[in-house]
Amino acid sequence: MSGGLAPSKSTVYVSNLPFSLTNNDLHRIFSKYGKVVKVTILKDKDSRKSKGVSFVLFLDKESAQNCVRGLNNKQLFGRAIKASIAKDNGRATEFIRRRNYTDKSRCYECGDTGHLSYACPKNMLGEREPPQKKEKKKRKRLVEEEEEEVVEEEESEDEGEDPALDSLSQAIAFQQARIDEEKNKYRHDPAEASTSEDSRRPRIKKSTYFSDEDELSD
């Protein structure tokens, strides 16, 4: 199973289809019954021409049942169409697996260049709008990739310390070391320490004239 799909219950087997109908034609025909996930036309191995048989995978079993009720034994381009719920042969997972067509320069239907299968001239019912769902998925993947890149950048920035903060811590440590050095110096030389302390204290000097008051000088 993939994406919650149940191909054994939501796949319609359609036969007696006009050989000229393309994959895109069938998409347009069956889309009236519900969301079509995939259309597979059985083709001759040698001629690559349609055998008039197709498997149509719907998004849900209700749409598949609506298709069977609405299309079985009905006339389509002058042919009586047979439609029934397909029997699971054990290859359901393989059937719904997404195929990637790397060569976008050629049409999947006719093999010519200059157009894609959605606009192939062999489409009896005209051009079909390319599915928008795939484009949304691509956009979503791009957004997710951008978010992952941002997360990676944020994580890389968290590794190690900020150089500015590192310089500040070094400056503080250097200043603290100088203070400690001065304190140790005063301990070893009390006279110098007292001299230094005296230099910070206000000095008392006597006035040039005799007085009982002392004069303070800076």
Curated annotation (Swiss-Prot):
Residues 132-188 form a coiled coil. Its main location: nucleus. SUPFAM superfamilies: Retrovirus zinc finger-like domains (SSF57756), RNA-binding domain, RBD (SSF54928). Residues 119-218 are annotated as: Disordered. Keywords: Coiled coil, Metal-binding, mRNA processing, mRNA splicing, Nucleus, RNA-binding, Spliceosome, Zinc, Zinc-finger. It is found in: Nucleus. It comes from Xenopus laevis (African clawed frog). The keyword Zinc applies. Residues 10-88 form the RRM domain. GO terms for molecular function: RNA binding; zinc ion binding. This is Zinc finger CCHC-type and RNA-binding motif-containing protein 1. The keyword Signal does not apply. Component of the U11/U12 snRNPs that are part of the U12-type spliceosome. Residues 178-201 have a biased composition (Basic and acidic residues). Residues 144-164 have a biased composition (Acidic residues). SMART domains: RRM, RRM_1, ZnF_C2HC. A zinc finger (CCHC-type) spans 105-122.
